[in-house]
């Protein structure tokens, strides 16, 4: 499958990339190179290979799931135009 200059123009437009008409042949050639590489990847036999996200198994460090108040309530509420009893106060919206 080959990318034409018109298709390269359309891809550039969809990607919101400004490409001069003189640069379209080079862009089309680069896109064709990318597609050729992807076609090569499709030829690789991966039957029986387990999906993986990386070559080294890693686990995220977990912290204790402890509920806290964030210890920043006063700092946050001092930026509010109106705060009452530890909460943001806003005008009534629904009657």
Swiss-Prot record:
GO terms for biological process: glutaminyl-tRNAGln biosynthesis via transamidation; regulation of translational fidelity; translation. Its EC number is 6.3.5.-. Pfam families: GatC. It is an enzyme of class 6 (ligase). Allows the formation of correctly charged Asn-tRNA(Asn) or Gln-tRNA(Gln) through the transamidation of misacylated Asp-tRNA(Asn) or Glu-tRNA(Gln) in organisms which lack either or both of asparaginyl-tRNA or glutaminyl-tRNA synthetases. The reaction takes place in the presence of glutamine and ATP through an activated phospho-Asp-tRNA(Asn) or phospho-Glu-tRNA(Gln). Heterotrimer of A, B and C subunits. This is Aspartyl/glutamyl-tRNA(Asn/Gln) amidotransferase subunit C. It comes from Paracoccus denitrificans (strain Pd 1222). The gene is gatC.
């Amino acid at each position: 499958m080959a990318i034409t200059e018109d298709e390269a123009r359309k891809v550039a437009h969809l990607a919101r990339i400004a490409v001069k008409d003189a640069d379209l042949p080079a862009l089309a050639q680069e896109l064709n190179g990318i597609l050729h590489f992807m076609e090569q990847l499709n030829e690789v036999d991966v039957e029986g290979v387990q999906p993986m996200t990386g070559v080294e198994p890693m686990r995220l460090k977990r912290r204790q799931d402890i509920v806290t108040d964030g210890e920043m309530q006063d700092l946050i509420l001092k930026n509010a135009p109106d705060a009452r009893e530890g909460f943001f106060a806003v005008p009534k919206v629904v009657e």
